[in-house]
Amino acid sequence: MPVQGSQRRLLGSLNSTPTATPHLGLAANQTGARCLEVSVPDGLFLSLGLVSLVENVLVVTAIAKNRNLHSPMYCFICCLALSDLLVSGSNMLETAVTLLLEAGALAARAAVVQQLDNVIDVITCSSMLSSLCFLGAIAVDRYISIFYALRYHSIVTLPRARRAVAAIWVASVLCSTLFIAYYDHAAVLLCLVVFFLAMLVLMAVLYVHMLARACQHAQGIARLHKRQRLAHQGFGLKGAATLTILLGIFFLCWGPFFLHLTLIVLCPQHPTCSCIFKNFNLFLALIICNAIIDPLIYAFRSQELRRTLKEVLLCSW
């Protein structure tokens, strides 16, 4: 990804010296002040990407295999898995090419590396945007299924879901291409930050509303069965904990990356901001961690999908 404060990884590898052993420690910024820099080992970066790649390939394969999973909800989950797969795969490819260039095992002209870097950047950026969009689409789908349960199948149809998916992919590719072309414009970075905040607010509002409705429903049942008041309280706490984990993971994994973009606009030369810029690879690693967690939250909790996945794994042996 083209970001201020850190050179492009592939192009920098052409003339780079062997890097020091990755570490967690204090590094000096431009003003001589000390700041915390977390270096992500390439082996860890590749390992996280591989785990995410395998997980999301399994999700896509299971949904494609089982016709019972060909519904709008699983369509969005499948596309989320595909987006996460591309996020992990593109970052793995960039890391692998960088290591080969640094080791001298791969010879390439600067122009070729520039083009490859641009392609990887577009894939990475578009898959990030689409991943955020599909997280929002899943939240909207679940909201409609709860608040418009009787009309759900007439509102959320498979053709409409497919059109939404196509629109998300096209918009993601176009926006990412513009971002790569005009990454040095503050307006572009601010648009990305606003988009992330919009997705965060959308998910928070929808899931909090769904939790409130579920608690009201449980409270109504508890009134009919007075003995179940403790169970109702436990349900509310469990729902709040689940919501906190879901939104917390989303913010923890995606927030640092968009904070990075925000600081590029607000304080590109400030010493403190420069310290944060040094941890860009850590922020990418957190996004890959989110790609690992997404299948656990949205896919593997489905009994039907787990059963299909088991069949796929048994057949592969």
Curated annotation (Swiss-Prot):
GO terms for molecular function: melanocyte-stimulating hormone receptor activity. The chain crosses the membrane at residues 38-63, 73-93, 119-140, 164-183, 192-211, 241-266, 280-300. Keywords: Cell membrane, G-protein coupled receptor, Glycoprotein, Lipoprotein, Membrane, Palmitate, Receptor, Transducer, Transmembrane, Transmembrane helix. Pfam families: 7tm_1. It is found in: Cell membrane. A lipid is attached at residue 315 (S-palmitoyl cysteine). GO terms for cellular component: plasma membrane. GO terms for biological process: adenylate cyclase-activating G protein-coupled receptor signaling pathway. The keyword Glycoprotein applies. The keyword Nucleus does not apply. Interacts with MGRN1, but does not undergo MGRN1-mediated ubiquitination; this interaction competes with GNAS-binding and thus inhibits agonist-induced cAMP production. Interacts with OPN3; the interaction results in a decrease in MC1R-mediated cAMP signaling and ultimately a decrease in melanin production in melanocytes. Receptor for MSH (alpha, beta and gamma) and ACTH. The activity of this receptor is mediated by G proteins which activate adenylate cyclase. Mediates melanogenesis, the production of eumelanin (black/brown) and phaeomelanin (red/yellow), via regulation of cAMP signaling in melanocytes. This is Melanocyte-stimulating hormone receptor. It comes from Macaca sylvanus (Barbary macaque). The gene is MC1R.
